[in-house]
């Protein structure tokens, strides 16, 4: 049962969760949010409580993102007098339409997304006074740039973490490029794009070139201590974007007032921290399956084969295997990679005794962990970060992914929980295995790079959940089942759905 340290952790976790929820609730007050659909595309309209018909800003998310991810910019704009419109691209978030067209051809998926942006923007103009600006992150930076270049009525374009080869010295109008200070390559891209207009001067960050009134304004801005996702929550990013809109639309603010940015980022981290921490004391209530913790308790010299052979053999075996059988980008490959990796691990461990464990306590513990994961991880992510609840076809995809992830985690937890340090090494080996797969087929599996941060985060969070469950139940299999469900869920809801 719970000891003093568990009670202290529980109190601290609950206090953190409560404080975060209060602040996050306040972050969504002061404006009205309305959801609707435009030709099947889910959108959210953020309107100032003051009413009126101000300019409209269409805000577009990046690859494998969703409109929830763009809430910091939307909230910043609406609190400062603009109407913001966010939406889910086809194949993303809660948009049930699959993304069509080639991912590598400009006239394929790129043009389809530009056309979808145009449909949303055409309708969004009617929500305000007719003036329009656009903001796009990562993949969507290229999309909004191309849309603005084909739509002379767009007053300003804000490209966050931009890569947009179609940018010229004069098009699109009034271009702001924002990058995180830790995005080295994208910082250079920002300066290159602005340098097209500043020439013969060398483009410098935080310097505005040209004029808003004739559409020639150009600026590159770098947000401190930010990477590819953190740049969205950085207050400097939001201030730069708001100031750019004010300049483009001629909005005047009181002296000394730079507008009110959205500070939800730290509170989201506090909420997730409290939710993870609370899992430790709650694990004390899980039923005991084995009196003595089970697992592969062997010296390291006998673990290197099951640790390294699957990591090397899996990407080699799958190099030429047909793994494109699901309508979700690289999700089918990941499912097969998990399955083959787990099967090879199990074969390597076949000479070792399978730990005996009671089935009922394991299933009860696994069920409790899965439910807690929905409450502590899925709900906060879906509400405050990005779309994380499956809909339509994605529900079935969770089940398909589970076949692969369950094979991997049952074998891996059996291997890794008995020997100190084995868990870290086994997860490192799996990530390196994915790196080998990408290196062997970069064009086909490039998008796996995007999910590696998510995999690492889930390895840490659910690794802790699994460790606490293992120490309490004595069985590695409760954590294995919970990990398998979590990873199957994350893969099925993260990657875009593809047509054909």
Language model: regions and residue ranges:
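N-terminal membrane topogenic signal
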Residues: 2-10, 475
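Hydrophobic membrane-insertion alpha-helices, especially the h-region
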Residues: 7-21
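Hydrophobic alpha-helical membrane-embedded or membrane-associated segments
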Residues: 10-14, 268, 272-279, 302, ...
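Alpha-helical transmembrane segments of multi-pass membrane proteins
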Residues: 19-24, 276, 280-281, 314-318
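Soluble extramembrane regions of membrane proteins in the secretory/endomembrane system
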Residues: 25-258
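Membrane-interface capping segments at transmembrane-helix boundaries
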Residues: 26-28, 286-289, 470-478
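Cytosolic-side membrane-insertion boundary helix
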Residues: 251-303
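Alpha-helical transmembrane segments of integral membrane proteins
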Residues: 305-500
